[in-house]
Regions:
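C-terminal extensions of enzymes
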Residues: 88-345, 383, 389, 395
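A structural motif corresponding to the C-terminal end of an alpha-helix
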Residues: 22-27, 318-325, 360-363
């Protein structure tokens, strides 16, 4: 296919995006003529399901070997660029001395082996939620592929989720929020599942309606927290409680490499699992425009102090209610005020480690359970009925 022979990968991306925008997600996309392993991760991430190509044989006929990072010629090799069952008993010199047909057959089997291996790698990456990390890695194989990748990051991060239909559909199709750590890199913040998570926070999160004393939130200030490590409920909660004791009208927000994370979403995957080296925090914030800020730098571990103070008990209860209501807002699409009202008088059941595993309403009915593996929420049947009775609308799938 001339498009790919000429390395016009940016045009290829635009074609797939245009196709994906119009074809229903349940319909498979068959990409004819795409047979280079280097392109598989990107095309699969964009929505391609099937590939049809004789590239493995055509490249072998010209003495070229396919690899996940590009193409190499047999004439240039002293060692094989990648291990394979097909070529392990031969040296490049021995293969060059073979007859045309024997050499072509051998290289074709090698190319087909590498092609199948890369497809298997992509399938496994989908299962583990690391496909976009693989796309980013492969994008460094050529300038043209890198250009195409950067265009993708611009498309999926443009505007809000509700306005960016193409980006939204790509995210919905390829990046469910899942547990597991994310290694930070230059373009990690453009991975769909991180864009999805930040987009939900930007569009749905707002401060709780009341502080822990029961007073309405009136121009609260941000408590920006830096220096802690996940899980933040262990490393910074003691500092958060002491700060709230001094000033109930503040909202704790964690400063991360990926941006700012409200403390009431501190255990929500994937944002709670980002791995990165230490960094200088960005003191700006778009969570609450114009809000006053207080900066709290946590040095090392900050374990919560043992205390029988009733205020501390009230703060802990408020933090739990704030966390559940924030997740109802961000994950279920509820208004924060309605979620807060719904949870009035809630009681909880804890795991052996002290984390909340079941939430009961004021009447003692089990309404939801926080998922300890990814920080999400699972509604019970009773909880879903109660949610519907609040006229909060149907929960959105995220």
């Amino acid at each position: 296919v001339p498009l790919m022979e000429q390395h016009r990968y940016l045009d290829l991306v635009k074609i797939i995006l245009a196709t994906r925008e119009t074809i229903p997600l349940e319909r498979p996309i068959h990409l004819f003529g795409c047979g280079h392993p280097m392109l598989f991760p990107m095309c699969i991430a964009l929505g391609a399901d099937l590939f049809d190509s004789a590239a493995y044989a055509l490249f072998a006929r010209d003495g070229r070997l396919l690899t996940p990072d590009g193409t190499v010629r047999i004439d240039e090799l002293v060692e094989w660029p990648i291990a394979s069952r097909t070529l392990h008993s031969h040296t490049p010199e021995e293969v060059r001395k073979m007859g045309k047909k024997e050499r072509t057959d051998l290289l074709a089997r090698f190319n087909l082996e590498i092609t199948q291996a890369e497809l298997a790698r992509c399938r496994q990456a989908i299962r583990t939620g690391t496909l976009w990390a693989l796309v980013e890695q492969r994008s460094h194989s050529s300038p043209e592929l890198r250009e195409a990748f950067l265009h993708i990051t611009e498309v999926i991060s443009k505007g809000s989720l509700s306005e960016n239909i193409v980006g939204q559909r790509m995210i919905e199709a390829s990046a469910p929020i899942r547990s597991g750590s994310v290694k930070w890199s230059e373009k990690a913040d453009h991975r769909p599942h991180l864009i999805h998570a930040r987009g939900l926070i930007d569009e749905r999160w707002c401060p709780p309606p009341f502080d822990w004393t029961g007073k309405p939130m009136n121009n609260p200030k941000l408590l920006l927290i830096s220096g802690g490590v996940p899980p933040w409920r262990d490393s910074v909660r003691g500092d958060v409680i002491r700060s709230l004791r001094r000033d109930p009208q503040c909202i704790p927000v964690i400063l991360m490499k990926a941006g700012r994370l409200p403390f009431d979403l501190e255990d929500w995957s994937p944002l709670c699992h980002i791995q990165s080296v230490s960094f200088e925090p960005d003191m700006s914030s778009d969570l609450m425009d114009g809000a006053l800020t207080e900066y709290l730098d946590v040095k090392g571990s900050s374990l919560e102090e043992a205390s029988s103070d009733k205020d501390d008990d009230a703060i802990r209860t408020w933090l739990e209610r704030s966390q559940i209501s924030a997740k109802c807002s961000v994950l279920l699409g509820m208004e924060r005020n309605k979620a807060w009202e719904w949870l009035e008088g809630m009681t909880v059941q804890r795991s052996s480690t002290g984390r909340i595993k079941n939430v009961f309403d004021a009447d003692g009915v089990h309404v939801l359970s926080p998922r300890l593996n990814d920080g999400g929420l699972s509604l019970t049947t009773s909880g879903a009925i109660a949610l519907h009775a609040l006229d909060a609308g149907l929960p959105e799938v995220v």
